[in-house]
């Protein structure tokens, strides 16, 4: 059983060559590649006096942040912590969830929720900053309406897929990075002493002496916010392509940052009133650079939107998020479209734009959430290194160094909380609460599923099959078995077959679903429990694979029929002689929680919130990819109150006359 579609383009992403490197530029580096649009501007607006020591110190911080955070942590370490080629915080968690640390899921959902929050602010700030460049040509242009129009188009086209434009992202980003590097290099020539910023001494002096060091660090951190994308996109492009491309990208970025710094030192009186990014552009290239910046902002936005869809798809299979309707607008493997999330993101981005109005105010909201994501990734990487047998000393040194660095950045970004950082923290907090409630509620539901030994019921199921006094319910009856222990079955499933309405069928199929720690696993095993009557199928599904049970079961059945392990021809003579297969019917056992069933207030609150959150999801039959015309849903109460209460009979004693 194999995953259905896989684009030839995607297949070649991992090959190291010009095409692979070009595609990597478009997929991976959109976010970090647009940072020069706003980083230097943010530094200048921290309130620190603009002079050579300030600019050299800030540039030194940028260079060494890119080196320590992006190059060493992500390119050299994190990209090696792959899950069968896939990267990202949830893929890393999937590798570690079998560890004894039961609370480790908290790190994953904190990191994922803040990463998703960052995905809402990124399109807003990148597109707004790019369009603001038009003000240098015509100060009266309506920036907000133009920005909203572009954002609307970006989110609208998601429903059609981005296969065609996605192939051109790399072709577009190559000249973008060359533009960054070349214009930066020309500007450096006007102030060669700016190259002293490579010396970390200037960063240390600035942080030691500046009273605004925390504000400067908060602005500097914006240069590496796209580093998490390098890790998340590992599965799309491969480690070697990302590592090689990063060498080129980092060089172009540093040249541009240095060029902006050189321009600032040559134009100190006017530096605060303009964006240095556009100021270093020759007048003849200004309009072209604005168009290029807008295009790069669109690429960055598209990468964040696609990344959000992928993260939530993984979260669904890891039981962190309710199942939602997922569409595949193209045949490209892994390209998803989640309509409700697309709409929610669009509304969120529009609110951010209308709330903050300009990129300078958005900078305050940017960076805080992604700092938390990076800190969670560091902690998970520490567990990963330990699980792989890396020296305890090296593991402690790695975790200690990066926890310290990222805690400093977190502290610096907290200074922006009241100015706008509260926005992404609020969004991330809501997403975390939803994930936490979902995880806890799912554990409660699983805990109170009563399981019984299946072999105790072989005989009665066989008897029901041959009892012609019972109306035939279906030729093939399929149940999803939620019992966790091998050899057991959900008692409500047995109740459905035997007690509620005895269901006679030719074949009974019990489907057990196990979500694997690997991304693309799609396998099954089949056990015949009662010959020609009862079968147990276990499907092993990777965390990036949608559980389309109806499709997979059809493939399994075709495989079993071809190997002559089962005969599914209809038992009706008129159909059997024409080799017509029997029909299938799925029974879904849906447990309904009633708050009064438990005296535990915490569980009541969790389950009530769970019921509210589940409303954004789809029902079980759609979540499992079942043909709804073949599905019967049976609702049963979820009993959590396990207290031993009994009803006493009132004995009435007749009075003797």
Predicted regions mapped to residue ranges:
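The structured alpha-helical core of multi-pass membrane proteins
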Residues: 2-657
């Amino acid at each position: 059983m194999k995953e259905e579609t896989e684009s030839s383009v995607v297949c070649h992403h991992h090959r190291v060559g010009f095409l692979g490197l070009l595609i990597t530029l478009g997929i991976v580096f959109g976010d970090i590649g647009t940072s020069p649009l706003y980083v230097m501007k943010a530094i200048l607006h921290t309130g620190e006096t603009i002079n050579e020591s300030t600019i050299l110190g800030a540039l030194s911080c940028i260079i060494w942040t890119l080196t320590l955070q992006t190059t060493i942590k992500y390119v050299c370490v994190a990209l090696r912590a792959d899950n069968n080629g896939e990267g990202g915080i949830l893929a890393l968690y999937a590798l570690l969830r079998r560890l004894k640390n039961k609370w480790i899921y908290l790190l994953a959902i904190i990191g994922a929720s803040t990463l998703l929050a960052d995905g809402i602010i990124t399109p807003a700030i990148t597109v707004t900053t790019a369009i603001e460049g038009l003000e240098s040509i015509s100060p009266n242009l309506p920036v907000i309406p133009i920005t909203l129009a572009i954002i609307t188009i970006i989110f609208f086209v998601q429903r059609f897929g981005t296969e065609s434009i996605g192939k051109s992202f790399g072709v577009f980003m190559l000249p973008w990075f060359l533009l960054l590097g070349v214009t930066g290099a020309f500007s450096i020539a006007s102030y060669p002493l700016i190259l002293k910023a490579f010396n970390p001494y200037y960063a240390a002096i600035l942080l030691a002496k500046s009273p605004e060091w925390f504000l400067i660090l908060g602005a500097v951190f914006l240069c590496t916010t796209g580093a998490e994308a390098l890790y998340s996109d590992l599965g799309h492009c491969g480690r070697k392509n990302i590592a090689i491309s990063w060498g080129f990208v980092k060089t172009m970025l540093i040249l541009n940052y240095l060029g902006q710094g050189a321009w600032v030192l040559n134009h100190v009186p006017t530096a605060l009133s303009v964006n240095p990014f556009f100021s270093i552009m020759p007048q003849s290239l200004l309009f072209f650079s604005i168009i290029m910046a807008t295009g790069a902002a669109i690429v960055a936005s598209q990468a964040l939107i696609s990344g959000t869809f992928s993260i939530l798809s993984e979260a669904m299979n890891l039981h962190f998020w309710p199942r939602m309707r997922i569409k595949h607008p193209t045949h490209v493997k892994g390209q998803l479209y989640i309509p409700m999330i697309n709409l929610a993101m669009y509304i969120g981005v529009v609110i951010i734009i209308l709330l903050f109005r300009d990129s300078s105010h958005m900078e305050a909201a940017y960076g805080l959430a992604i700092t938390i994501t990076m800190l969670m990734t560091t902690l998970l990487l520490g567990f990963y290194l330990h699980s792989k047998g890396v020296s305890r000393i090296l593991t402690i040194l790695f975790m200690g160094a990066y926890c310290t660095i990222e805690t400093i950045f977190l502290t610096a970004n907290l200074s922006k909380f009241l100015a706008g950082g509260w926005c992404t923290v609020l969004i991330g907090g809501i997403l975390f609460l939803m994930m936490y409630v979902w995880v806890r509620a799912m554990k409660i539901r699983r805990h109170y599923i009563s399981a019984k030994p299946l072999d105790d019921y072989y005989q009665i199921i066989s008897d029901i099959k041959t009892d012609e006094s019972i109306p035939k319910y279906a030729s093939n009856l399929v149940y999803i078995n939620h019992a966790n222990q091998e050899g057991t079955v959900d008692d409500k499933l047995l109740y459905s077959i035997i007690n509620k309405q005895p269901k006679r069928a030719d074949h009974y199929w019990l489907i057990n679903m196990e979500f694997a720690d690997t991304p693309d696993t799609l396998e099954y095993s089949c056990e015949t429990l009662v010959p020609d009557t009862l079968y147990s199928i276990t499907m092993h599904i990777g965390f990036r694979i949608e559980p389309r049970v109806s499709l997979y079961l059809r493939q399994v059945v075709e495989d079993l029929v071809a190997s002559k392990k089962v005969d599914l021809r209809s038992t009706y003579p008129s159909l059997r002689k024409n080799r017509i297969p029997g029909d299938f019917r799925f029974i879904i056992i849906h447990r309904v929680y009633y708050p009064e069933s438990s005296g535990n207030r915490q569980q009541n609150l969790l389950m009530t919130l769970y019921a509210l959150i589940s409303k954004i999801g789809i029902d079980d039959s759609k979540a499992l990819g079942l043909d709804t015309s073949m599905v019967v849903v049976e609702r049963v109460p979820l009993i959590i109150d396990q207290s031993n209460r009994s009803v006493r009979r009132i004995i009435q004693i007749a009075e003797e006359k």
